[in-house]
UniProtKB/Swiss-Prot annotation:
<dbReference type="Pfam" id="PF02673">
    <property type="entry name" value="BacA"/>
</dbReference>
<keyword id="KW-0046">Antibiotic resistance</keyword>
<keyword id="KW-0133">Cell shape</keyword>
<feature type="transmembrane region" description="Helical">
    <location>
        <begin position="215"/>
        <end position="235"/>
    </location>
</feature>
<feature type="transmembrane region" description="Helical">
    <location>
        <begin position="135"/>
        <end position="155"/>
    </location>
</feature>
<keyword id="KW-0472">Membrane</keyword>
<dbReference type="InterPro" id="IPR003824">
    <property type="entry name" value="UppP"/>
</dbReference>
<feature type="transmembrane region" description="Helical">
    <location>
        <begin position="75"/>
        <end position="95"/>
    </location>
</feature>
<feature type="transmembrane region" description="Helical">
    <location>
        <begin position="181"/>
        <end position="201"/>
    </location>
</feature>
<comment type="function">
    <text>Catalyzes the dephosphorylation of undecaprenyl diphosphate (UPP). Confers resistance to bacitracin.</text>
</comment>
<keyword id="KW-0378">Hydrolase</keyword>
<dbReference type="GO" id="GO:0071555">
    <property type="term" value="P:cell wall organization"/>
</dbReference>
<keyword id="KW-0573">Peptidoglycan synthesis</keyword>
<keyword id="KW-1133">Transmembrane helix</keyword>
<keyword id="KW-0961">Cell wall biogenesis/degradation</keyword>
<dbReference type="GO" id="GO:0008360">
    <property type="term" value="P:regulation of cell shape"/>
</dbReference>
<feature type="transmembrane region" description="Helical">
    <location>
        <begin position="38"/>
        <end position="58"/>
    </location>
</feature>
Length: 265
């Protein structure tokens, strides 16, 4: 398979999985086993495509918040987004300075996918018993910030899965409201993570030797696919539960756990 096709597929995969509760990092680590490992710079660029996608998909909501800061409800919402982001940033930096690294094997990813699927089913079951609420509390904001760090530390967990369901269990029980808040928090989080990673790469001597055509194709693919996925998901969860994603995660995790010993042998 050519490097260009590989880059295209990885870009599409990033766009498909970044916002669905199935773990983009986990899927990219799995895909790299067959499509080849790419540089950190390449991975940052395709995540930038996902960032652009969500900004475009939520542009009306972002504009409404920006122009409506005179209203107390909007100021309160933006402040809680900021607090969730700051919690992620501070705790995430502590974890990073402690020497955390992505796993080099797929077994932790497989377990995270499997356990995360079970978590989704259990969490939605209990959240479904709560009265439907769409108000973001400070407790929810702080918990979402912490959940983002957990998702970053354990690839396969999924940022959207961990954050949406912790928000629902803590009182933001309306699925669409939980997803809206989580996606809003994700925008500064992904911007900051990508910027920090680029700065670290620059300090270490540059951005590698990636083919710029491959990078551009992957970026565009991630942007287009991510935009479509966000718009679709926000409509889907208004009428449906996350069950299909939970089942997919459990099947994929179980399949990986069965395949890994055979592949090693």
């Amino acid at each position: 398979m050519s490097d260009l096709i590989s880059a295209l597929l990885l870009g599409i995969l990033e766009g498909l999985t970044e916002f669905l509760p199935i773990s983009s990092t986990g899927h990219l680590l799995i895909a790299e086993q067959w499509l080849g490992r790419r540089s950190d710079f390449f991975n940052i660029v395709i995540q930038a495509g996902a960032i652009l996608a969500i900004c475009l998909a939520l542009r009306q909501r972002l504009w409404s918040l920006a122009t409506g800061l005179g209203e107390r409800a909007n100021r309160d919402y933006v402040l809680k987004v900021g607090v969730a982001f700051l919690v992620t940033a501070v705790v995430g930096l502590i974890v990073r300075k402690a020497g955390w690294q992505l796993p080099e094997t797929l077994q932790p990813v497989a377990w995270a996918l499997l356990i995360g699927g079970v978590w989704m089913l259990v969490a939605e079951h209990f959240a479904g018993k709560l009265p439907e609420r769409d108000v973001v509390t400070w407790k929810v904001a702080i918990a979402v910030g912490l959940a983002q760090v957990v998702a970053g530390v354990f690839p396969g967990t999924s940022r959207s899965a961990s954050t949406i369901f912790i928000a629902m269990l803590l009182g933001l029980s309306k699925r669409s409201a939980a997803a809206d808040f989580v996606f809003m928090v994700g925008i500064p989080t992904m911007f900051a993570a990508s910027g920090y990673a680029l700065l670290e790469m620059y300090k270490e001597g540059g951005f590698g030797t990636e083919n710029w055509t491959d990078v551009a194709v992957a970026f565009v693919a991630a942007t287009i696919t991510g935009f479509v996925v966000v718009k679709w998901l926000l409509g889907y969860i208004k009428k449906h539960r996350f069950t299909v994603f939970a089942v997919y995660r459990m099947l994929l995790g179980a399949a990986l756990l069965l395949w890994l010993p055979a592949a090693a042998g």
